[in-house]
């Protein structure tokens, strides 16, 4: 019965948020929910990290210049943006340089050939040809008034005296 009482007590102390009472040399650790040596909570005052025992964790110092996670969050995108910008500037300058080189090499040789070619393919419109900016309309038919309109929008049949709206899904009273 004593073992049961201890088991119930230990489960109760794990589930409760109230820390268990510990000795003066021990401190309550909420992670393991048990009393541990208080020396594990404090880092030694010495500046040498090599003298620490393996398995002890260092707490981050408040006097550190720049935390590595902040440097990664800001530095990595900034470096990536700089690399992309330099690549874009390099590509634009390379394309413009190639374009200038092609213009420089092509201009002395083809200046006369371009003029000859452009004069040979000139189209001179006659006086009967309408102006290029004038719209061209199809000729009107003689029987435009008698032809039925070619629209697909359903219209109400008011000319027959009916007041209901004619749609594609409704059937009129004629049917």
From Swiss-Prot:
The keyword Amino-acid biosynthesis does not apply. Residues 29-34 are annotated as: Essential for TNFSF13B/TALL1/BAFF/BLyS binding. It comes from the Eukaryota. One of its GO terms (molecular function) is signaling receptor activity. Keywords: Adaptive immunity, Disulfide bond, Glycoprotein, Immunity, Membrane, Receptor, Signal-anchor, Transmembrane, Transmembrane helix. Residues 1-71 are extracellular. Residues 160-175 have a biased composition (Polar residues). It is found in: Membrane. It is linked to Defects in Tnfrsf13c are a cause of severe B-cell deficiency. B-cell deficient strain A/WySnJ has a 4.7 kb insertion in the BAFFR gene leading to an altered C-terminus. The mutant RNA is not detectable. B-cell lymphopoiesis is normal, but the life span of peripheral B-cells is much reduced. B-cell receptor specific for TNFSF13B/TALL1/BAFF/BLyS. Promotes the survival of mature B-cells and the B-cell response. This is Tumor necrosis factor receptor superfamily member 13C. It comes from Mus musculus. The lineage of its organism: Eukaryota, Metazoa, Chordata, Craniata, Vertebrata.
